[in-house]
Amino acid sequence: MTAPHETMSFQAEVKQLLHLMIHSLYSNKEIFLRELVSNASDATDKLRFEAIANPALLENDADLAIRIEADPAARTLKITDNGIGMSRDEAIRNLGTIARSGTKEFFQQLSGDQQKDAALIGQFGVGFYSAFIVADKVTVETRRAGLAADEAVRWESAGDGEFSIDAINRAERGSTITLHLREGEDDFLSSYRLQNIIRKYSDHISLPIRMPKEEWDAEAQQQKVTGEWESVNQASALWTRSKSDITDEQYQAFYQHIAHDHEAPLAWTHNRVEGRSEYTQLLYIPARAPFDLWDRNHKAGLKLYVKRVFIMDDADQLLPAYLRWVKGVVDSADLPLNVSRELLQESRDVKAIREGCAKRVLSMLEAMADSEDEAERAKYKTFWEQFGQVLKEGVGEDHGNGERIAKLLRFATTHGDTAEQSVSLVDYVGRMKEGQDKIYYVTADTWVAAKSSPHLEVFRKKGIEVVLLTDRVDEWLLSYLHEFDGKQLVSVARGDLDLGALADEAEKAEQEKASADWKEVVDRAKSVLEGKAKDVRVTLRLTDSASCLVSDDGDMSGYLQRLLKQAGQKAPDAQPILELNPEHALVKKLRDLPDGEAFGDRVRVLFDQALLAEGGMLDDPAAYVQRVNRLLA
């Protein structure tokens, strides 16, 4: 079978990525070999997996390996694997387009700062395109396992926006990538240099990486090729080796291989689990959140092996969703080789693995968070900045570990004048005032809005610490986290706020007296706000502000209503309660005004100001401006 010569254009995103890599990754050029070896390893993993159901794909060649060969005379470098290979359509799709989620978001995050962009590009997974960092032309010859020799293809590009594809004859299954090196890249023709890069980045690859064997020629005073091939890596799966035989550098290199992340992980755990389920786990906590963490199509999960045979990437059933950022490998001794994603959802062994992995990850986080070592605590601070919002999901998702997760949460509070989320609930409880039996919090869109909330005034006056919640996930968190250490979590914006022993009898008597004294004014204000406010009353919770809005017990807060509406969901139309500060001049003026426009304007302005103070939106901003202007005139 033959197909015509074709010249095609790269997808626009590929052109952009090629340009970025060539100009942003020049300081770390050697990663191209790591990426190409990683791809070759993946190709052999896929062949092993498909050959379980169809052994004929091995074509009597089960000695899977990667070969790397430099030709100084031709200035070329070849990377060959005998893995699954590609058909013509697969070559066009895999080498000409980026078929993954989050691509648009990735390009939006690029800043022009070479160091930051290099980190992002590495995280995105430069893969095959990294070849163009050192090559001005790349040729790929490939045949998919199971196809005839004349169905092989040659793909070629100079990285200039186009690529050609031709039909060729190729007896060998798999792929050969030939890099035609740019001027000045002769360093990558050195066998010694190539072996160092392989041992640095790819020593853990579980199949042999072979290079032409060289020996010293004493007569010629130089290395010469013997005609044999030798393995230059350990060629054993890292997780199958004893922990005592693995260096930190090897653990980090393996992480970079599976995560496509050039940064070192914050922590890792490597364990062999025996009992009801037998498996090995090697789990990593990354130092940086992936750019598409919040993308609904984000691929999460661990690499799954069964008895050292690769089964699938992104096995998300092996971890609860709130740990979707964890990277690593699970190798099970119990699951069948033909396990499917559907079977994983029903398997008791997988449930045991998921629970075991979750406990190990939480143990790593606890070790960092509770460490006496400042460097370890700094790692937890980094973790929280990157993944804290996702960890909050765990309180509702993982009831069995809910208490452990709650202890790991960090918040901003009124204890410090900073938006940094560094206070644990354990810290908060340890600082509670004598007689305090509740944990108080306020929710808002931003830290500035939270710390400026009128609801905090009485708490500041009494020196009571309040947790400032500003993440979108916080309202969801509160629907599950009702108490901590026996202390109920209470919103300061609740209308029935009870300070218990923190409110003295004199204050309670004063509140009752104010309610009686202001009854006539309050009743008139209720008439003005009929249909907008559920109730109007005076309060002693305010010291500086004239008014605030609170929610009745059992009603949804205004903040949560706004979040639901922003998400396009229907929110119950619960009306707030307007509370007035009887000591504020704007409120006192109400006593002197008869029913009419002036009284109505002042009441509506007090309501609208309270709504704005909590981050709400006015139904009619123009009318608000007119009322304020009339008050100022």
UniProtKB/Swiss-Prot annotation:
Main location: cytoplasm
Residue numbers spanned by region B: 342-562
KW Ion transport (keyword) present: no
Gene3D superfamilies linked: 3.30.230.80, 3.40.50.11260, Heat shock protein 90, C-terminal domain, Histidine kinase-like ATPase, C-terminal domain
Alphabetic keyword roster: ATP-binding, Chaperone, Cytoplasm, Nucleotide-binding, Stress response
Residues covered by region (C): 563-633
Entry GO CC: cytoplasm
Alphabetical list of PROSITE patterns matching this protein: HSP90
Region feature (A): 1-341
Record's subcellular location: Cytoplasm
GO molecular function, one term: ATP-dependent protein folding chaperone
Pfam families named among the record's database cross-references: HATPase_c_3 (PF13589), HSP90 (PF00183)
UniProt subunit comment: Homodimer.
Family: Belongs to the heat shock protein 90 family.
Function: Molecular chaperone. Has ATPase activity.
Protein name: Chaperone protein HtpG
Lineage, uppermost ranks: Bacteria, Pseudomonadati, Pseudomonadota, Betaproteobacteria, Burkholderiales
